[in-house]
Amino acid sequence: MKKIDFYFDFASPNAYLSHKVIQKIKENYDVEVNYIPVLLGGIFKATNNKPPMEQFFGVKNKNEYQNLEMQRFIERHELNDFKMNPHFPVISLQIIRGAVAAEMDGFLEDYIDKVLVHMWEEPKKMDDPEVIKAAYEESGFDGEKLMTQMQDPEVKAKLISNTEAAVERGVFGLSLIHISE
């Protein structure tokens, strides 16, 4: 059985796009997926990288071409529910900490599925605590508990550890998929 390590942060539309394709792969192949929440901003800082919108600002046609490639990917994989979040870029620190808390409590995949909907299908301002809590409640999660867990030192430490381990593994941007036997 092949194993997929999927490093992700909800801040990137690529998290949504990659996750949806991974779901199709899981349906058709014998694979195990290990979801690893990391902080994209922390990866950028550690690797001296920048978001594409910033890095390629002023490079004629670069961002336009990147948007065209994204649209082609969406069409190719029939990801018709995707919508660019009008609040983009969203500071994802709280919801990615929520992913770590969900992982610790055993419902990470469900959490990912639902938070990605709130980010990229029914776009919400997912860096506003009131919006986040309401989205959690709408998803059937205990919003109060998750909001509290985001501040837990153990959750914070695990996110830092995941992010540092990703950088040590060579990650410099997201989403990243590592496949092994």
State the predicted function of each range.
Residues 178-181:
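Conserved small/polar residues in nucleotide/adenosyl-binding loops
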Residues 115-142:
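Histidine/lysine/aspartate-rich catalytic loop segments that bind and position anionic ligands
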Residues 152-171:
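Thioredoxin-like thiol-disulfide oxidoreductase module
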